[in-house]
């Protein structure tokens, strides 16, 4: 399994680990943000696909923040050196995500959207996501009701903004950690105080 650091696991991760990939290289959730952008009137994302990615079916583009990886198959597609060489090429917007989509096209097992529910950053649910095909948008909206993994993709993070989408889920887990007070202090701009200096007399009396 590979997972980005800006997410919360809200379901049984063993279910994800046990995903049967067969001969496929990767298991992943379709990227509703990318797919929605394909249908935007400005045509920028569609043009990027044609000129840079050259994918046969860009609507199969997946989000690389949560991946089930068949490492044996990945090494058959490219050696580690080849993967790194490809990754060093310029011109990609989403770097590793773009490269994985291009090189693994046709080798993907698509997961239920609940395994990578991207939160509503900057109102994208009703400004980008809803431009995706109806079946894609409906599957995403259904996954929001029972997310197994919530992905805080984008600039709006619950540890910076407690009012962002799905922030309550993040903080419900944060409250179970021994450092929640420090997290709240950091979010509030409270700096850690310097350790107090011992008074000479107090030390002498010890």
Located regions from the model:
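GT-A fold catalytic core of metal-dependent nucleotide-sugar glycosyltransferases
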Residues: 1-40, 68-69, 75
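Short, mixed-charge, low-aromatic patches
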Residues: 5, 52-59
């Amino acid at each position: 399994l590979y997972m980005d650091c800006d997410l919360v696991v809200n379901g049984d991760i063993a279910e994800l680990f046990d995903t049967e990939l067969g001969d496929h290289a990767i298991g992943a959730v379709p990227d509703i943000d990318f797919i929605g952008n394909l249908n935007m009137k400005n045509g920028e994302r569609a043009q990027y696909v044609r000129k840079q990615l050259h994918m046969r079916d860009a609507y199969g583009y997946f989000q690389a923040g949560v991946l089930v990886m068949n490492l044996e198959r990945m090494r058959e597609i490219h050696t580690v050196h080849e993967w790194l060489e490809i990754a060093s090429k310029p011109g990609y917007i989403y770097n590793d995500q773009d490269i994985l989509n291009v090189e693994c096209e046709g080798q993907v097992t698509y997961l239920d959207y609940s395994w990578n529910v991207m939160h509503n950053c900057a109102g994208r649910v009703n400004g980008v996501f809803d431009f995706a095909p109806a079946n894609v948008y409906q599957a995403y909206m259904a996954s929001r009701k029972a997310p197994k993994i919530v992905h805080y993709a984008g600039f709006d993070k619950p540890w910076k903004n407690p009012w962002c989408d799905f922030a309550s889920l993040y903080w419900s887990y944060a409250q179970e950690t021994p450092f929640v007070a420090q997290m709240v202090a950091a979010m509030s701009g409270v700096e850690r105080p310097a350790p107090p200096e011992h008074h000479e007399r107090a030390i002498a009396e010890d």
